[in-house]
Amino acid sequence: MPKRYREGALDAKLRSERTRSEAKLLHKAKLAGVLCPTVLEVGEFEITMSFVDGTRPEMDSKESREAGRMLAKLHEADIIHGDYTPANIIRSGESGALYVIDFGLGFVSKDVEDKAVDVFTMLRAIAEKDAFVAGYCSYGKADEVLKRVKDVEKRVRYAV
């Protein structure tokens, strides 16, 4: 959506770059083994992708563990989701598999801090934290990231 508060040419450039970036992240996530919508076409300001018919998961223990595994795969590929919460996961009505959606705030980064913020964001949103962490531990550098999550948590508590 165009932003009226931004100068027209700048707005068009930003929206176009963000559209291409999201499409690339979706493709990269799929290559990393993460279930997500398939990009069918990329226009200047829109992405046409496959439709995942389903519902938001309850994030029980099993789903939380799987969400942790999926984030581990994203982080192995240095993909930062940017808004990794249950609202951006869909349980397929057909297969029951979990799909990650909405990479609009995502980016590529090797930075442990960026990965820790992704983990922290999900941990704040779910009850089954231990299951999520158990799934995330399939990431080779999970210990380093989880240690940083504690630092992020302290900063957030202090800021509030």
Question: Where are the model-predicted features located?
Answer:
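Residue-level recognition of conserved beta-strand positions in structured domain cores
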Residues: 1, 41, 50-51, 102
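ATP-binding glycine-rich loop module of kinase domains
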Residues: 1-20
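Short, conserved loop/turn and helix-capping segments at secondary-structure boundaries
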Residues: 16-19, 61, 113-116
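Conserved HxN/HPN-centered segment at the entrance to the catalytic loop
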Residues: 24-42
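Conserved kinase catalytic-core helix
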Residues: 26-32, 55-93, 98, 119, ...
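Short Gly/Ser/Thr- and Asp/Glu-enriched loop/turn motifs at secondary-structure junctions
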Residues: 42-44, 84
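Conserved short submotifs of the Hanks-type protein kinase catalytic core
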Residues: 44-56
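C-lobe/activation-segment region of protein kinase-like
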Residues: 98-160
